[in-house]
From Swiss-Prot:
Biological function: Responsible for the release of ribosomes from messenger RNA at the termination of protein biosynthesis. May increase the efficiency of translation by recycling ribosomes from one round of translation to another.
Biological source species: Pelotomaculum thermopropionicum (strain DSM 13744 / JCM 10971 / SI)
InterPro entries per UniProt: Ribosome_recyc_fac, Ribosome_recyc_fac_dom, RRF_sf
SUPFAM superfamilies to which the protein is assigned, alphabetical: Ribosome recycling factor, RRF
Gene3D superfamilies (UniProt xref): 3.30.1360.40, Ribosome-recycling factor
Taxonomic path: Bacteria, Bacillati, Bacillota, Clostridia, Eubacteriales
Keyword Signal attributed: no
Similarity comment: Belongs to the RRF family.
CDD domains noted in UniProt: RRF (cd00520)
Subcellular location: Cytoplasm
Keyword Cytoplasm: yes
Any one GO cellular component localisation term in the record: cytoplasm
Gene of this entry: frr
Protein name: Ribosome-recycling factor
Length: 185
């Protein structure tokens, strides 16, 4: 029973790491990546639809994204959605494709991004700690109900703590990698 709770906690912690990775990938660090457009939603026949479901997104150069819609009629809508997004990128359209030149990051924008990624990392750490707390509470209630001994409880809590430490360390590692990426001129 304790093993199942620990496996569930680890699974939830892995999901938290994936969320943090996605959050970091969607932040512009001066380099073009299709993940930048993951959160951009286009009003497609009245339905909010992600850009990557309406177009092919390619990276021909380090600072250039090319968005090639499969349906040319949706091109103006994609352009509008990119303008409305908080990416700080102005789309240039030639009627067939949209080109997004990724500008060099300013010092202010870098500082802003640093704050954002630190906040996202802290949210990830808090989520992992909450998973630890919930798992420990479930373990304690099992011990109270007589389903496990105090030694088993202590062993299980130590295992949950090791998982917590490991995944928080992983978030810290992701954070430092992203910080280096942002500070790279």
């Amino acid at each position: 029973m304790a093993g199942e709770l620990i496996k569930e906690a680890e699974s939830n912690m892995k999901k938290t790491i994936e969320v943090v990775k996605k959050e970091f990938a969607s932040l512009r660090a001066g380099r073009a990546t299709p993940a930048l457009l993951d959160k951009v939603m286009v009003n497609y026949y009245g339905t909010p639809t992600p850009v990557n479901q309406l177009a092919n997104i390619s990276v021909p150069e380090a600072r250039l994204l090319v968005v090639q819609p499969w349906d040319k009629t949706v091109l103006p809508e994609i352009e509008r959605a990119i303008l409305k997004s908080d990416l700080g990128i102005t789309p240039a359209s030639d009627g067939n494709v949209i080109r997004l030149a990724i500008p060099q990051l300013t010092q202010e924008r870098r500082a802003e991004l640093m704050k954002v990624i630190k906040k996202k990392a802290e949210e990830g750490r808090v989520a992992i700690r909450n998973i630890r707390r919930d798992t420990n509470e479930q373990l304690k209630s099992q011990q109270k109900d007589g389903k496990m001994s105090e030694d088993e409880l202590k062993r299980s809590q130590d295992e949950v703590q090791k998982l917590t430490d490991r995944y928080i360390k992983e978030i810290d590692s992701l954070l430092s990698t992203k910080e280096q990426e942002i500070m790279q001129v």
